[in-house]
Each structure stands twice: as structure tokens, then as C-alpha cells.
Amino acid sequence: PECVRQQNARGSRARVVTRAQTRSRWSAAGPGSHGGLSVTKVLIGLNLLVFVLELLTGATGIMGGGSAQAMLRLGALWPAAVLVQHEYWRMFTAMFLHDGILHIAFNMWALWVVGGYMEVAVGRLKFVVLYLISGLAGSVLVLVAAPVDSLVVGASGAIFGIFGALAVHAFLNRGRDFQSRALLGNVLFLLVINLMFTFSAGRVSWQAHIGGLLAGAVTVFAMMLGGRKDPRRPFGTID
């Protein structure tokens, strides 16, 4: 860059280059910025398509509500159906269902904010594994701790897992670069806000949120132990 060539002192040039590289790595960590197909965008698109199906079948209305029977037919998580009738597939399908436009809008916004960073950090395949494990873990805790007549839908468990994974990843890399330290503070702030909402708002499945959060944190920790860090890629990328 021209600003680098105009520097007279070698140390000043080095500082300018370092700052430019830091900004470049930070901006490269956004959703889909690693090139090719973005899993985060695919997941958002899939959730939106399923939401349209919910509207068409009456499983939900624009502002929520709708037919509980229609939601069950689409795969909502009903503990009684899983534990008694062994409909284990509901633990997976419920992750793609939402109750109203506000529910899906908030979840997809959160997925867009944190999903792209985590996808860059661990890679597409491991991001999918992390997402699914977190969502399924949230469903497991619903089965264990929620009333058997609960009807649970939403991607919140999987998204909380991404939050937990991103927090652990940034914490373990906090001494390596500035963006990891900054990211850690931002993620922890968002986590605190979301946890406050989880335990203060009505009709929110804390079981799905906490189950996903813990599973995401543990899963990415295991990935980092089993992988190697490459300092040339954002956030100490896991291979």
C-alpha cells in the first residue's frame, strides 16, 4: 500500500503492515467470506423454506400460534412422542421449525452473526457437525428436564451451541491476536444477554438453550485438541 511505502522508519512500516493484516483477517471472518458455498447461508435458507411450509400448513401464523397438530406433523419435539412412541427423529426436525416471524427472525439473525465466524474457524464440515450436535444436545436436555407435554421448536439449541463454541475458541486463542480477545468480549456479552432472556421470558426452553450451549463448548474444545492451529488463518483455524 502507498501508506507503507511513504514510511521512513522500518519499525513504522512493520506496524502499519501488521495492523493492515489484522484488519484483513478480521474482515475475512464474516459469513461466507471464505469463498465457495456458505453453510451458514444454506442453514438460514433451509429454515426460511421450512417456515414458509409451516405458514402454508397452518402450523404457525405470522405472529405465532397456529395448529399444534400441524406442528406435530411437521416434526415438533414432543417429549411424550419420543419417550413413549420412540419418534426420535423429532429431536432433529424440531431444530428447523419456528413459532412465528419474530422467533425465526431472531434465531436467523443470531445464526448470521456468529455462524459465519465459526464456519471460517472450523471449516464447513466441522461446522455442520457442531451445529447438529448442539441442536441434538438441546433436544436431549428437553427430554430429560422438560415436562413430557411440552411442545418445543426452534434452532436456539444449535445457535447457543455456536455461541458456546465461539466463546471457547476465542478464549483459547485470546493470547494469539487482538481479534480473538475482542471477539471473546463480544461473545460473552451476547451470551449474558441471551441467558438473561432465557430465564426471564416465558415460553422459552431453557433446556434446549443450556444443552446446546454446553455441547457446543465441549465439541469445539475436542476439535481443537484433535486438530492443529494454523496462524495464517483466522482465529487459529482448526484443520
What are these regions (language model features)?
Residues 2-239:
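A detector for small-residue-rich transmembrane helices and their helix-helix packing motifs
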